Amino acid sequence: MLRSVPPQTGLLATRDTPLEVSQTSSSLKRLRSLMPSMAAVRQRPVHILVSPTCRRGFHEEVRIHQTHHPRIPAGLLLEVSDDLLCCGPELTFLQMAGETSLIGASVLGFELCGAYAHFSQMISGFYDRPALTSKVRISEALAKLPGARGIKRAKEAFALVLDGSRSPMETVLAGALSFPTCLGGCAFEQPHLNYEVILDQAATGVAGVSRCYLDLTWPAQKRALEYDGAAWHTDVRADRRRREALAHMGWTVNVIDLGDISSIAPLAGTVRLIQDCIPRESDEPIDLGNLKDLLGRLLKATRFGLGANAALFGVPVEKGLINVHL
């Protein structure tokens, strides 16, 4: 639901009062009447949360789960219709943490706390939207649900998440550089994502703007990595003047592109660029074999290279066999 209904539409309001779970129903007749309201959910079955006193009847498009929490706190549910609620981003993070890997849960956290969303269908790509939540709000939600299923994994994944990612590849790069060595990461100090730099008068004159936003940043060291994605960097001259302005301010900015992130050799080169100036949270050496494995898992979790053919056709279609126009 969170991927199918962009927040820009304003269709899902947050429920501002607690929900007594005893008020929920698993009546199949009632569920059938609500199915039109679930049309935005592209995948089936739809998962329904009810109290332990509700029957777990069978419906081919619905899977019913029972919760032993008597009350769901205010602010964790969204209103789809008068009689239908869906889990908000914080509760979704908790629930999915119990169903997926630690890497998968953390990548979901980056997405929920970032300004992008994957599509509801299992294809690569993403769309822009405002952040659905933040680390502060997820932390508050987890504190309200002690003992909930998946809470341990959710807290582990939460520690890895950063606010502010604008794309899956920013998430991949941040994860590879900041995740601990036990997960295969480089264990660099966590960067700030899309950090705001206020320019002085001279730098403003060069850049033509009074502030800049840097993709991955370590402010104390004035070091930054910029992901050179085609969607953001279409004005080469403006980018050059922006980087000249940042250099005037004492910043060192390294630019990387998709090829630098999607395979281990160029990523290792990026690591060498910053390893002498960015603090690490581990004394263990960076293991490039483990980093390669983590990179593969991060790319898979962000659907890298997962084409649209599986969503568009009912049979496997060899890449390049058909010209598709979207």
Predicted ranges, named:
Residues 1-150, 181, 286, 293-326:
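Short gly/ser-rich loop at a beta-strand->alpha-helix junction or flexible surface loop bordering the NTP-binding
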Residues 128-326:
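Surface segments flanking catalytic/ligand-binding clefts of nucleic-acid enzymes
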